Amino acid sequence: DLAGQALLVRSNSRITSIADLAGQNVGVVFGTTAEKNMLSLAPAANIIGFRNYRTAYTALKDGKIDALTSDDTILSRFAYEDKSVRLLPKRYTKEPYGIALRKGKGTKRLKENIDFAIKDMQRKNVILRLRRKWLKL
């Protein structure tokens, strides 16, 4: 799996899991699957929407929200660059990612090669090792 929904909190936060979000302000980016998922995963949380990740991240840093949720691949960048926040280890969903290819002649073979390469990297745990090395996940 390439991505899953996770939580980013301030380093001194007492939030350790999605169960701790009741009554807390949780930031999401409008129109994302994270917004939709949070409504069912944490119905007692106060969901606060933002136009983009940078604004939501700033709100977390400024204490306007208690947690920020999105794909772990997005949130990991903030945690990697800023030790005043931390990414909680649990993933609450599996988020599919896609690769866009041009329609037409030759695309079928390219798609097969890409699919093979990704599956091979998953089978050999290359993706897991890269995530741990570079994203600290």
What role is predicted for each listed range?
Residues D1-S11, D72, S76-K119, K136-L137:
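Periplasmic-binding protein-like
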Residues V9-V26:
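Flexible hinge/capping segments at coil-to-helix
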Residues N12-R14, T33, I48-T58, D62, ...:
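Short helix-initiation/N-cap motifs at beta->coil->alpha
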Residues A19, E35-K36, Y57-T58, S76-R77, ...:
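Alpha-helical elements of the RecA-like P-loop NTPase motor core of helicases
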Residues A19-A22, S40-L41, R54-T69, T73, ...:
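Short helices/loops that flank or line small-molecule/ion binding pockets
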Residues V28-T32, R51-R54, D62, T69, ...:
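Soluble non-cytosolic domains of exported or imported proteins
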Residues T33-F50, K83-R91, I118-L137:
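Ligand-binding clefts/hinges and TM-proximal coupling segments of bilobed small-molecule sensing domains
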